[in-house]
Each structure stands twice: as C-alpha cells, then as structure tokens.
C-alpha cells in the first residue's frame, strides 16, 4: 500500500536561513506569467517586530502594499515591546517573494529572521511513501509475510498465474512512466527533474481513487528501450500510465505497449485531456443549444493532446473539425511522413481550408486550444459564430485572455484553477484506472474513453449547468466513482 506523506505546514517545523531557491525553469514556466498571488508561491516568514501592536499593523500594511495575500498571522512570543510573529502569505512568483522579504527588512524595527517556501517544504523527502497493510510485529507475523510462509503464496501464483491479481499489489497498482522529455510547460528536463511531477501524479491517484501508483522515471529517450523496460516491469502492475513523453515517440510507445501487453496502457497527456475536453464540450453545447454533429470546431495544436482530442471528438460524432499548427490549417496539400498528422488531414477539414488560425476562427462554433499562450485576441474570438465555446487550455498562459474571450464567447474554459470551468485531467485518470483495475481490464477502447467523458459530464446536473459551470470541480467526490462505474460497465 502506498501513502501520501503529510505536508509540513509551518516554518516552526523546518527552518532555512535563506529560502530554497526556485529553478529558472519553474520561473520561466510559471513565475513570470502568473501575476496574481497563488498557493504555488506561499511563503512563511518569522519576523521580529519592535514597537507593539501598531508595528505589527505596519507589517501587515507593507505586505498588502506589495500585493501579497496574507493567509495567516500567528504571534509566537511577545515580551518588552518585541513581538515574534509567523506570517504566511501567497505571492505571485519567486521574485515577488523576495520583494516582500526585502520590504519588511527595510522597515524600522522589523527583521525577517527566517523564511521558507511551502511548496518546497511539501516536497522535502518526497510526497509519497510505502505503508504496510498488515503489521509485522512478531515472529508469527514475519513467518507469514516473508519466509517461510510466503513460499506457499509464490507457488500458488506459479500454479495459477491469474492469482497474481488476487494475492499481490498488482490488483491495485499502476506505474507512472516517463522519460522527462515533455514535462508540463517545462519541456525536456530529464527523468530526475520530472520525479516531483510523477510523485504528484501518484499522490492524485491515491487521493482521488485509492489507486497505488508509483513513479518510474527512465533515463533513456530511445523508443525501443522504453518499450522494452516497460514490458519487463509490467508483471508488477495492473496498468501503465504514460506521462510527459514527447511526441511523436509517445504515439509509437503507447501503440506498441498496448499491442504487446495484457494490461491497460494509457497516455494521459493524450487521452486524459481528450476525455475531459469531451466532457466539458458535451455540457457546453447544452448551454448554447447546439449539437456536436453540427458545430464547426477549430483545434489549435496537433501534438499528443490535439491528436487525441480530434480522434475522440470524431468518435463521439463531430463532423466538422479543422486542426491547426503554427503554419496554419492541416490540409490535403500539407502531407508529410508523419502518419498521425496525415490521419488528421484524411479525417478532418472536408472543405480543404488552407488559411491561418485567425482566418479559420471566422464563423467557427468551438475553439479548442492545446498549443501556446497569447496567440489570439478577444477580437479574434469576436469573429466566431454566436454562442461560441472557447477552451483555451495552454498552461500557464491560455491562447487567449479568458476575460477578453468572455466578452463575446458564451462559454470559456481554461486549464487553470483561477478561472471558472477548469479542464483538468485529474477528473479523468484516477476514476478511469479505478474502474480498469476493478474489472481487471486488459485494454482501453474508444468506447471506454467516451464513457468516461459522459460520466464526468453527468456529474453536473441540469439545474447546476450554466456558462460558468460546465465541468465538476476536481474535489467533487462523485467524479471518480462515477467514472470508475462507467468503466466497470464497459469492461
């Protein structure tokens, strides 16, 4: 059994005389683009303040003036006009955190003794650990859990291999496999740097569906070697979740593993995104009163996520889709040796449109962006059909400013938690694997993906459904179980 390690809340537990530094990659991916205070950049400061109550108020004022958001303030000690206080506040990025510290140190009678970044504190020693399901407290326990008693269980599996699902962790365990080549918005950062993300993924599996997942970060980019390694470790796992492997290698790796293994293989960057997009679109089209088979859909980005989104939408009945990359529409005259792009060309863009993304938006009903930030303006969205649906999913900066899009679009969704209608893969993968493991499934089909999307969409009732609530929140406990149930019924 795997267990999420409890977080370390306050500086009282762990002190640093200087803050743990954020990497330049993290700043580039998040810090310089996030302008509002965020829990991603929560800091806790221990401060000496001279001058009594008014001085403490001045400290609070200074933090507010520098646009940080105070979460908590606790008096640690107070004696002879000197207070020691712990202040926890959200900042916008690493530079903003340092500005807050510098501003406090510049005040008369104020000294920042120590400060820490709570995100880094949460990660000290990792976020997950192994825990025992059965205690081993004496020789009797030991003789059953290990030698000699375990030999009987080994031979039972040897004689009846199907019993591995009943008698080992395989029945509830998933490998989260990456080579670290396409990590979030950070790109090719390697397997070691990818590990915190994979730990986080494993924690989400456990938190939302009680699935025991474990990171497997591979120090190779060779397609054949990755396939070989995953096949070799597969006997331990009931499923394989491929994560953050760059395109186009991810397509071949998934396809080959699905063909050669007898357990489900799921590339979340492709299909997890596609499931949640379809779920959100099902409900968004209800809001605007349109049918999937009738609407014209523009998809910006035809990599792993875009490819899977297009395939799943077609499987659900969409008939009018055009895919776009940085060079414009994918059309019959633009075929290459990339089989996945060519498949999109052969199955979409029936009118063979050859223009740019901005041109393709004119008169479109739906925009789905899985590409790059700030490539469109509110004026571009205004050229879409009435009752437009806009899913701007690039992170951390959407393809178009959500507020600008909302001036003319009927429904707007992003991949971010600070806007309504967050399209987040965590709505899909925990429940999906819960259902697959429960059913001891060996494959994942398009019908299963569609069923998962329908299950997510169904959590939002007709009474709740509106333009700012088309998709349930990630902490809605109904989501995972409903998805799991849909998968069990499909298997």
Located regions from the model:
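A conserved regulatory-domain signal marking ACT and ACT-like small-molecule sensing domains
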Residues: 12, 22, 27-124
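Glycine/serine-rich phosphate-binding loop and adjoining beta1-alpha1 elements at the start
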Residues: 112-295
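Short, structured coil segments at secondary-structure junctions
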Residues: 108, 209, 260-261, 317, ...
């Amino acid at each position: 059994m795997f267990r999420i390690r409890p977080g370390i809340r306050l500086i009282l537990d762990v002190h640093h005389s200087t803050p743990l530094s954020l990497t330049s990659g993290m700043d580039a991916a998040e810090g310089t683009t996030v302008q509002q205070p965020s829990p991603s950049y929560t800091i806790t400061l221990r401060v000496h303040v001279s001058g009594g109550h008014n001085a403490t108020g001045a400290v609070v004022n200074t933090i507010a003036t520098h646009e940080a958001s105070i979460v908590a303030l606790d008096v640690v000690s107070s004696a002879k006009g000197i207070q020691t206080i712990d202040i926890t506040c959200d900042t916008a990025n690493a530079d903003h955190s340092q500005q807050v510290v510098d501003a406090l140190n510049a005040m008369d009678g104020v000294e920042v003794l120590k400060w820490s970044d709570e995100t880094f504190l949460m990660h000290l020693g990792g976020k997950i650990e192994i825990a025992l399901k059965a205690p081993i407290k004496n020789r009797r326990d030991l003789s059953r859990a290990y030698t000699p008693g375990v030999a009987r269980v080994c031979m039972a599996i040897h004689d009846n291999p199907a019993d591995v699902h009943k008698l080992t962790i395989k029945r509830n365990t998933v490998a989260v496999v990456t080579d670290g080549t396409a990590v979030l918005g950070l790109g090719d950062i390697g397997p070691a740097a990818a590990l915190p993300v994979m730990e986080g993924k494993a924690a989400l599996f456990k938190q939302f569906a009680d699935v025991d997942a474990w990171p497997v970060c591979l120090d190779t980019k060779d397609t054949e070697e990755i396939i070989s390694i995953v096949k070799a470790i597969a006997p331990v796992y009931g499923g394989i979740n491929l994560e953050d492997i760059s395109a186009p290698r991810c397509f071949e790796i998934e396809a080959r593993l699905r063909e050669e293994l007898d357990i489900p293989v799921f590339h979340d960057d492709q299909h997890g995104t596609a499931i949640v997009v379809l779920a959100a679109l099902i409900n968004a089209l209800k809001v605007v009163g349109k049918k999937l088979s009738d609407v014209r859909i523009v998809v910006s980005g035809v990599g792993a996520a875009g490819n899977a989104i297009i395939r799943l939408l077609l499987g659900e009945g969409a008939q009018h889709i055009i895919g776009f990359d940085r060079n414009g529409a994918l059309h019959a005259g633009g075929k290459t040796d990339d089989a996945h792009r060519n498949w999109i060309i052969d199955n979409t863009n029936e009118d063979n449109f050859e223009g740019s993304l901005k041109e393709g938006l004119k008169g479109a009903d739906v925009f789905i962006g899985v590409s790059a930030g700030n490539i469109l303006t509110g004026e571009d969205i205004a050229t879409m059909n009435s009752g437009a649906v806009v899913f701007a999913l690039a992170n951390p900066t959407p393809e178009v400013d959500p507020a600008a899009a909302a001036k003319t679009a009927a429904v707007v969704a992003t991949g971010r938690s600070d806007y309504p209608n967050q399209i987040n893969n965590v709505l899909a993968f925990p429940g999906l694997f819960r259902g697959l493991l429960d059913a001891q499934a060996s494959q994942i089909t398009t019908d299963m993906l569609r069923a998962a999307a329908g299950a997510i969409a169904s959590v939002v009732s007709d009474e709740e459904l509106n333009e700012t609530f088309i998709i349930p929140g990630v902490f809605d406990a109904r989501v995972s179980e409903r998805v799991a149930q849909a998968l069990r019924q499909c298997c």
